[in-house]
């Protein structure tokens, strides 16, 4: 092979490597977005399952008189609502997100934490009482 052909071949390979690198970057970005969405959907499903189980437990027996007629919530319903408030589901969801390697701070919310490194902003948010 002559020198020009070798140079052209190396230049062509360099272009192909650049394109592959770009494709790999795009793929990595898409994968990160999919992981974030998957995590968000898993947390939402867990939250909805908890609410459904609380609703099923708190469903009062059918009565002739309804809550709307009295204008007051049934005692079981009040207890379920109070339990839901006490659970601190939002905080639990943030802790779960952080444990799975995502930022929960307002600076980088939802983006993956690099190499599972701790984020001071996230930790300060999670340690608030």
Swiss-Prot record:
InterPro entries recorded: YabA (IPR010377)
Disordered, as annotated region: 52-71
Residues binding Zn(2+): 103, 105, 119, 122
Localisation per UniProt entry: Cytoplasm, Nucleoid
Biological process, per Gene Ontology: DNA replication
Keywords: Cytoplasm, DNA replication, DNA replication inhibitor, Metal-binding, Zinc
Compositionally biased spans, kind Basic and acidic residues: 60-71
Cofactor binding summary note: Binds 1 zinc ion per subunit.
GO cellular component: nucleoid
Keyword presence, Metal-binding: yes
Cofactor(s) in the UniProt record: Zn(2+)
A family per Pfam: YabA
Bridged cysteine pairs (disulfide): none
Main location: cytoplasm
Sections of the chain in a coiled coil: none
Transmembrane region(s): none
HAMAP family: YabA
Family membership: Belongs to the YabA family.
Subunit details: Homotetramer. Interacts with both DnaA and DnaN, acting as a bridge between these two proteins.
Function description: Involved in control of chromosome replication initiation. Inhibits the cooperative binding of DnaA to the oriC region, thus negatively regulating initiation of chromosome replication. Inhibits the ability of DnaA-ATP to form a helix on DNA; does not disassemble preformed DnaA-DNA helices. Decreases the residence time of DnaA on the chromosome at its binding sites (oriC, replication forks and promoter-binding sites). Tethers DnaA to the replication machinery via the DNA polymerase beta sliding clamp subunit (dnaN).
Protein's UniProt name: Replication initiation control protein YabA
Native species: Listeria monocytogenes serovar 1/2a (strain ATCC BAA-679 / EGD-e)
